Amino acid sequence: MKIEKSQRNLEIDRSRKNDFLYPLIFREYIYTFAHDRDLNRSILLENVSYDNKYSLLIVKRLITRMYQQNHLIISANDSNQNTFFRYNKNLYFQMISEGFAVIVEIPFSLRLVSSLERSEIVKSHNLRSIHSIFPFLEGKFPHLNYLSEGLIPYPIHLEKLVQILRYWVKDPSSLHLLRLFLHEYWNLNSLIIPKKSISFFVKKNQRFFLFLYNSHVYEYESVFFFLCKQSFHFRLTFYQVFLERIYFYGKIEHFVEVFTKDWGDSLCLLKDPFIHYIRYQGKSIFVSKDTPLLMKKWKYYLVNLCQCHFDVCFQPQKIHINPFSLYKHSFALLGYLSSSSVRLNLSVVRSQMLENAFLMDNIMNKLDTTVSIIPLIGSLAKMKFCNAVGHPISKPTWADFSDSDIIDRFVRICRNLSHYYSGSSRKKSLYRIKYILRLSCVKTLARKHKSTVRIFLKRLGSELLEEFFTEEEQIIFLIFPRASSISQKLYRGRVWYLDIICINELSNHE
């Protein structure tokens, strides 16, 4: 019974394959939706791709060209002869890649909706905040002994990325067109940027490439996760059977036979229900409370799994295993990037079961997180809000917008950062970042009106600064208008929000 259940778990649910993705490539609303989604994704992004030139007329010309013979086969000679295409060469490919990114995500969205319907789970309850990892670490830090991390192979050949989609998309026309587009785009840019075509492609098509890349990594991670769970259920496992698992993806139909082989001398190879795995910033990381020997076994199994079945070159010498104590006092995660930014302290919480009963002191682990000023200033400098040392400067590219639009853009950035770092224990660095954004906003407005900062502030008064208050500050000052000490104490408190599902653009500075 247990074996049959395991066999069912191995079968990937691909019943929701979509046969009608190809016609969507020629629909105008797909590219309009892709453009609007990219524009609204982050106010920080400069629209260097096609925002200023985007129009439905260009979309119609693009679709007309795609309807022509040979579809997307565009040679260098063709681009030189066609004046319109030569001028908008990168524009065409950028728009097509954004359209593909929308289309290939449709089957995955359908699977998510169907899974929610089958489980009858309210969608709001299914949200998972990336900040939930910090409360998780508070309970797990004292019990983890070793950490293994290694770089995931990158880049991967484009053909492998296309092959991954064959499991999810049962539409040969879409796959052929996708393969043709990738190779033509790659070859065309190889003429312009030799030896850097893959990096150029990734930079210009981040969402599309990351979707394909994550789909590829998910394939062998799903196998790895399954075996991690089974190592706990099948505690006494044959070493011969363990080797068979390396190729079990191609032997799903013989899964029962593999597990019903002769049970000879048992070897407890893997027995660790306390292993935790995470993929972060291109690294494969897993931690455990057991011995280094067990970690080495997991390491070489992951290498064999990737190399033998998925043809991914995982180099064992680049996967390092270190005592977890080295990371307990210096940890970088999700934008909290400074050294010693995470410290594990003991917090005493007093509780009383009944009135007039004795008090109980409960010792809890507290994970103190601080905002690192250097990476954030580097991100602000990259976005032209300040110079390299943190002095605010005006934003010339925004000077053509209206006053309300300029203020709204700065306020949104400021509030998003406050929201993202709301769980920080020490927010002095965050106050400096907010000061830089406020002064950069004032300098941008003064530049627009050809005035000085001092004169502009006198004319505008304190109304501008009030715009930068977050919702939390406004509520606190509304409840405690006179008790400034109480309001400051509450505002300095840590609040982890459960609706943060991606890393803030400024926090993800490289």
From Swiss-Prot:
<dbReference type="InterPro" id="IPR024937">
    <property type="entry name" value="Domain_X"/>
</dbReference>
<comment type="similarity">
    <text>Belongs to the intron maturase 2 family. MatK subfamily.</text>
</comment>
<keyword id="KW-0150">Chloroplast</keyword>
<keyword id="KW-0934">Plastid</keyword>
<keyword id="KW-0507">mRNA processing</keyword>
<comment type="function">
    <text>Usually encoded in the trnK tRNA gene intron. Probably assists in splicing its own and other chloroplast group II introns.</text>
</comment>
<keyword id="KW-0694">RNA-binding</keyword>
<dbReference type="InterPro" id="IPR024942">
    <property type="entry name" value="Maturase_MatK_N"/>
</dbReference>
<protein>
    <recommendedName>
        <fullName>Maturase K</fullName>
    </recommendedName>
</protein>
<dbReference type="Pfam" id="PF01824">
    <property type="entry name" value="MatK_N"/>
</dbReference>
<keyword id="KW-0819">tRNA processing</keyword>
<dbReference type="GO" id="GO:0008380">
    <property type="term" value="P:RNA splicing"/>
</dbReference>
<dbReference type="GO" id="GO:0003723">
    <property type="term" value="F:RNA binding"/>
</dbReference>
<dbReference type="GO" id="GO:0008033">
    <property type="term" value="P:tRNA processing"/>
</dbReference>
<dbReference type="GO" id="GO:0009507">
    <property type="term" value="C:chloroplast"/>
</dbReference>
<dbReference type="Pfam" id="PF01348">
    <property type="entry name" value="Intron_maturas2"/>
</dbReference>
<dbReference type="InterPro" id="IPR002866">
    <property type="entry name" value="Maturase_MatK"/>
</dbReference>
<dbReference type="GO" id="GO:0006397">
    <property type="term" value="P:mRNA processing"/>
</dbReference>
